[in-house]
Every structure is written in C-alpha cells, then in structure tokens.
Amino acid sequence: MKEIAVFGLGTLGKSLAISYSNMGGKVIAIDKSQEKVDEISDYVTFAIRADLTEENVIKGLGVANVDVAIVTIGENFEASIIVTAVCKEIGIPYIIAKARDKLQGNILTKVGADEIVYPESETGIRMAKNLAHGEKFMDIAEISDTFSIIEAKVPESWVGKNLMELSLRKKV
C-alpha cells in the first residue's frame, strides 16, 4: 500500500487517516492542534503537531518520501496553499487537496495539486441522486461525466437471470 501524509485532521482528514490506517496503510497525520494529534495518535503510524503555515516546518516533517499527500485543511486556505506548494517542491509524487469551491480548486491546482476534491458539493450531489432515485439505487459512483457504477436493488424477477435474458437495452 502507498504511504500517505494527511495534512489537517478535521472530520475529513481524521476519517481518511484512520480508515486508511485500518486498511493496513502507513499514515503520517499532521495538524496544528495538539488535541487532534493526540486523538489520532493511536490509530496512525505517526501523528505530528506542526504549524502548517511555515514552509521550513513543513519541510522538516520528514514527509518527502510519502507516495501521496492529502491536504484536508478546512479553516485556513493559506495553509492549504503553502502545504500544497511545499509538497510539490519536495517531490511528493501525488497531491490531493480539499477545496470549498472552484476558485480554491483552481488555485490549489496552480500551486501543485494533482487532484481536487470538493467533499461538501460531492456529498450534496450524491444525496440528491439517491433521493431522486428513491430506493432503487443503493450507491452511485461517478466514473466520468458519461459513466457511473450503480449498486441497485433488483426486482425479484431479475434474480438468477443474466443481462442478455433481461433485455435491459430494450427496456431503457
């Protein structure tokens, strides 16, 4: 598994760090709050308290050899920019950054993020789709603008039949 560094231990960062660690991944979790670092220290490989607005502090964290940096800082966009830029500068191969909106996403991309996530809007879209489709769909994962993977509850009449027997294309 890849070794990751998670910068910012709010709801998203903490959940990501603990979940990935529970799957067997190595996680370096970093936050400015000693309380948040203490809460997560038993669950991750390393938990570090650091001022993420200081370039030299970030460079001194020993994260240059991780495979992926995930920047989930929510309250201080300046810190997100600095962390993203420094991670790119020290050669971390892949950087994922959290943004609130497209403007933040564009800025983070310009300073080095390879992937931008918008947790609030992505959750809202997923909830709306689930509500619109009622109980038909259990989960929807968007692969691209034109492809999705859907986990659906199937009618009893479909059980035991293959896709050809169902003639789904004729019914759509």
Where are these regions (language model features)?
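Cytosolic regulatory regions of ion transport systems
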Residues: M1-V172
